[in-house]
Amino acid sequence: MPQLNGGGGDELGANDEMISFKDEGEQEDKISENVSAERGLDDVKSSLVSESENNSSSSDSEQTERRPQPRADLESYEKAREYFTEALRRQQDGGFFKSPHYPGYPFLMIPDLANPYLSNGALSPSARTYLQMKWPLLDVPGSAALKDSQSPSPGHLSNKVPVVQHAHMHPLTPLITYSNEFPPGTPPAHLSPEILDPKTGIPRTPHPAELSPYYPLSPGTVGQIPHPLGWLVPQQGQHMYPITAGGFRHPYPALAMNASMSSLVSSRFSPHLVPHHPHGLHQTGIPHPAIVSPVIKQEPNGELSPPVNTKSPGPNKKDEDKKPHIKKPLNAFMLYMKEMRAKVVAECTLKENAAINQILGRRWHSLSREEQAKYYELARKERQLHSQLYPGWSARDNYGKRKKRKRDNKTDSTPEDFSMRSKKPCVQYLPQEKMIDSPGSSHGSMLDSPATPSAALASPAAPAATHSEQAQPLSLTTKPERFPLLSKPPPSSSSSSSSSSSSGLPTPPLLSRPLPFALLTPPSPFHQAALHSHHALFQSQPLSLVTKSSD
């Protein structure tokens, strides 16, 4: 049987692709030699019998002329039988082929996905091994040899195998090789709908046991297949299902996947191969009529589920809105306004409700007790009638919703508001110009001592004193009996400082923040020290003036 040369192998695949045609040819040659040896023994026996019966040389020459023709028929028959037994044995192995293949039958090369990957998803060349997998999708190059014994052998066909893509295939499917037995436009015979299921009579896709083509696939395209491909490796007790992509002829033409649908499914699984879930297929490879793709079938359910959840609070809100708004009974003043409003509008040319209500309010207060008692009696009757009409009503029904909305809006901002309100009176958050410009408003009522801040402001050293007070260090707490004053007080403030020292009150020119009322009384030395330490905690400026304690 002819073998492929090296040039033919380079044309069929890439340099790193494993194509072993020589070993396959040698194995087939060995098989053919064994068969011919057995037939040679039979021929020798038959020739001996014929020579014993016919002792003429003419009969021997006739038998030698007749032998080649039956031998050719026997060779083709034995060849076909071996082919089917080999295919059956390989099918029982689980769809993966361990022995070499015939040279005329190309095979699918799928890399071992357990090996390490490169960063871009392709397999590393050093660690690349291949799994030989059946591709039960397209035509059989040697199928014509079973129909016609005069057809060329697969070895002759494999030299002319073009690597093209079927016209009816989806662009996502990888490149396949097929023999020139079928043109690209015509589908092969085993994919035509003439193949009927003997039980159901429905056109079906042939089972992998009936097909035996192996199609080469470049490792670069398979390198992008994601690792957890459970549909590639058959589980125990499961058969290998054909992959039904958008380009292959579907057993049910109405359920065939178009290009958009197959692209949608391919985006969920793999950029090159579009698997069909095995649970949607029968044992014969026929998809269930109600299932096209489980992914597409689940999307409407996912879209319908959120509205179901959102509709549950909807009826409650609608029921609350449908409840009639019950007005509260009118009080005496409202009854008076209802009666006198038309008169006021007729007397005055005012159209503003605020002005009209003001006039009505003045007139209501000008009424005597007897006149008002009449309206109070009407209001009491109004309340009784309202309680009879609406026994379970309360004013909270009308105001509960509004208060609840206000609470929901204010829950997030209430802690910040309280903290800001407490910090607003603090002088440290105000600019220093405002502190100096308006000392009387913030500090005038703080201390009831003879030394008021106004007397301190009258001196030229007052601004420096405020700055020094803001820069008081924490070491002031070490000497509780003594209080820092200016090292050189001016003559104008000497009387105030002496009077303050005799009274025992601290005389800082300006305090950094207002004091509570509990500290307005003359404090003890301990309270004074705590007060100064508390104010010193809020100061951030460095020490600018050296202060000395006065004895």
From Swiss-Prot:
Span list, region Disordered: 1-76, 298-326, 392-525
CDD domains: HMG-box_TCF7-like
Gene Ontology CC: one annotated term: beta-catenin-TCF complex
Residue spans of biased composition, Polar residues class: 469-478
Residue ranges: DNA binding: 326-394
Alphabetic keyword roster: Activator, Developmental protein, DNA-binding, Nucleus, Repressor, Transcription, Transcription regulation, Wnt signaling pathway
Record field: compositional bias (Gly residues): 1-11
SUPFAM superfamilies named in the record: HMG-box
Keyword Repressor attached: yes
Chief subcellular location: nucleus
Comp. bias regions, Basic and acidic residues: 19-32, 63-76
SMART domains, A to Z: HMG
InterPro entries per UniProt: Catenin-bd_sf (IPR027397), CTNNB1-bd_N (IPR013558), HMG_box_dom (IPR009071), HMG_box_dom_sf (IPR036910), TCF/LEF (IPR024940)
GO BP terms: brain segmentation; canonical Wnt signaling pathway; cell proliferation in dorsal spinal cord; embryonic pattern specification; endothelial cell fate specification; generation of neurons; heart development; hindbrain development
Gene3D superfamilies referenced in this protein's UniProt entry, alphabetically: High mobility group box domain, TCF3-CBD (Catenin binding domain)
Intracellular or extracellular location(s): Nucleus
GO terms for MF: DNA-binding transcription factor activity, RNA polymerase II-specific; RNA polymerase II cis-regulatory region sequence-specific DNA binding
Signal peptide: none
Assembly mode: Interacts with ctnnb1.
Role played: Participates in the Wnt signaling pathway. Probably binds to DNA and acts as a repressor in the absence of ctnnb1, and possibly as an activator in its presence. Regulates anterior-posterior patterning in the neuroectoderm by repressing posterior neural fates. Also required for hindbrain morphogenesis.
Protein's name in the database: Transcription factor 7-like 1-B
Species of origin: Danio rerio
